[in-house]
Amino acid sequence: EQVVMNYYRAIDREQVQFDFYFFKGSKFVPVEDIKAMGGRMFVLPTFRPPLKYLRTLRRLLSENKYDIMHCHLSTLSFLPLLAGKQAGVRTRILHNHSTSGGAREWHRNLAKFLFKPFAKLHATDYFACSQLAAGWMYGSRATAPLSEEYDPVQKHRRVRIMPNAIDTEKYSYSEKKRREVRQELKIPQSATVFGHIGRFCPQKNQGFLVDIFREILKQRKNSVLIMTGTGEDMELIKARVIAAGISDRVVFTGQRSDADRLYSAFDCFLLPSNYEGLPVVGVEAQCSGLHCLFSNKVTPEARITGTAQLLPLGKPEDWACAALCCAGLRNKNAAAEVCLLYTSPSP
């Protein structure tokens, strides 16, 4: 939702207008923002049963006569793309933001493997947030540069890489936000704060993050870990923090809509994910000038500035050492650098 809304806020809505389709029970849809910008919203039944979902979506797409549909559901996009094809939507974009998961998510990986060819079959255009996400979904041939060897008819099937864009001004560092957030969360201004923002799930690997922070505390007692988000693993991670005896040094904020303020309060950003496409939180954190530690499962394209490192998911001690070395080394001009990098034409 966040990536799509970033584009929607910035786009010329007199030229292009969005309608949003989401599942019944979706929790993070910014309804008021969409209404204020002239967008319409349609609530869909869940995929189960799939025929009901397909009939409902096909009817709505037919009635509204869209020029373009843009799907962000990874391999599960095969169903809405099929509905769009049947409804006569001429341009159907499959936009991938992810790769495959770890061993704990074998059932999800199997589903992705089975659905992937059908998602590609029903799309007319391929998008991805990074080369890693593109290669996983579309294969090496689709991500290769265009050349005369390729059939001109198939050129539209090449992948368009669309990095997850953000409002750089919003995420620039603010001393005022830093003081305010620390006061709100009752964190001393002198503390070293390590931050993490993400859904609590196997992909984000928060269990390993807790192990990293235990090692950090052995060397720097005044450290605090802020973990922001919700998800199916949240209670499991809370229990792990309690079992480690560090609950007085860890702050769970729940879901927040002010990530820009949180980044200013952090001294270092940690993202030890098991897999990623191009994490927008990593872009935001670098824009705020933070030194960031990402796992090497994250695409190298996430290293936008010189303040991000990719580390293997090995020993928590290695991560702790790297985090302590870079904590507090903030680049307060990073927002301007990120803006320049994002807007500079490719060679």
Language-model features: where?
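A conserved mid-protein helix/loop that constitutes part of the nucleotide-sugar donor-binding site
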Residues: E1-N6, T192-E215, E232-K238
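N-terminal strand-loop element at the rim of the active site
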Residues: Q2-K52, P145-P152, E232-D233
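Short His-centered aromatic/hydrophobic patch
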Residues: C71-S77, H95-N96
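Carbohydrate-associated surface elements
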Residues: L132, A165
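A short helix/loop element that forms part of the nucleotide-sugar donor recognition site in Leloir-type
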Residues: A142-Y150, S172-I187
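Aromatic "clamp/platform" in nucleotide-sugar-dependent glycosyltransferases that forms part
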Residues: Q255, N274
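Conserved small/polar residues in nucleotide/adenosyl-binding loops
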Residues: Y342-P347
